[in-house]
């Protein structure tokens, strides 16, 4: 998205603000830390505008990694909701979160981003927040899918993000099994329990290869 804006606006002064920040808590002045990615001038201006004692702003030059992390946290939140809804246990939810970070890191690196960004506020921070709370729309949607319950909120960005991520993953030849599962989760004939079991039956491999 940031690349599209830069191209359309003919302006490199684009910033990406991301991080663990439920809107209501920001409104209520609860302590929050986020990251703004962009060129130095953009970081300095954004920090000047947004940084307060309650809202801490860190800087990053990694727009790609920050953007990918912000999109993928919604995908992994859906997966975490599915695991929670299927009552597969806390071990499974922790595994989904950790392997979700690995998938995000591979995607970010493949697109030219920095893997360390994925383990900062935009990635691990936001992913943890979104994957461990019913306040997260994406987590709640995944939970509702697993429970076969209706869910009216249409602001579940993770489904569309997962479909786009899989298209990119195929082009750059990386595996993203959790993301792929989420991308098919809206299929009425898709049995989530079976698909999670199949994912666990994949051949063993080294953690980071």
Question: What feature does the model see in each segment?
Answer:
Residues 1-29, 47:
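Rossmann-like NAD(P)(H) cofactor-binding subdomain of soluble oxidoreductases
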Residues 13-15, 56, 175:
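Conserved beta-strand segments of alpha/beta enzyme cores
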Residues 15-18, 35-37, 79, 122:
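Short beta-strand segments
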Residues 20-26, 51-77, 84-87, 114-122:
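Conserved Rossmann-fold dehydrogenase catalytic segment
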Residues 41-42, 64-71, 93-96, 100:
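Mid-domain beta-loop-alpha active-site segment that forms a flexible
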Residues 73, 80-84, 109-209:
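NAD(P)-dependent Rossmann-like dehydrogenase/reductase catalytic/cofactor-binding core
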Residues 98-111:
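An active-site-proximal "capping" alpha-helix that borders the catalytic cofactor pocket
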């Amino acid at each position: 998205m940031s690349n599209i804006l830069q191209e359309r606006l003919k302006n490199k002064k684009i910033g990406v603000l991301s991080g663990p920040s439920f809107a209501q808590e920001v409104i209520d002045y609860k302590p929050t830390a986020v990251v703004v990615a962009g060129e130095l001038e953009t970081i300095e201006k954004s920090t000047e505008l947004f940084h307060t004692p309650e809202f801490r702003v860190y800087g990053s030059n990694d727009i790609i990694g920050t953007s990918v992390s912000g999109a993928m946290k919604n995908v992994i939140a859906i997966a975490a909701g599915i695991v929670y809804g299927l009552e597969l246990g806390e071990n499974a939810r922790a595994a989904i979160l950790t392997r979700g970070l690995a998938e995000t890191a591979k995607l970010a690196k493949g697109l030219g981003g920095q893997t360390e960004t994925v383990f900062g506020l935009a990635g691990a921070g936001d992913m943890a927040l979104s994957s461990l709370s019913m306040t997260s729309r994406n987590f709640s949607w995944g939970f509702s899918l697993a429970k076969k319950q209706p869910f009216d909120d249409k602001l579940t960005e993770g489904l569309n993000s997962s479909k786009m991520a899989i298209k990119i993953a195929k082009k750059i030849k990386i595996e993203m099994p959790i993301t792929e599962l989420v991308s098919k989760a809206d299929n009425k004939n898709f049995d989530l329990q079976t698909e999670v079991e199949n994912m666990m039956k994949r051949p063993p491999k080294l953690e980071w290869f």
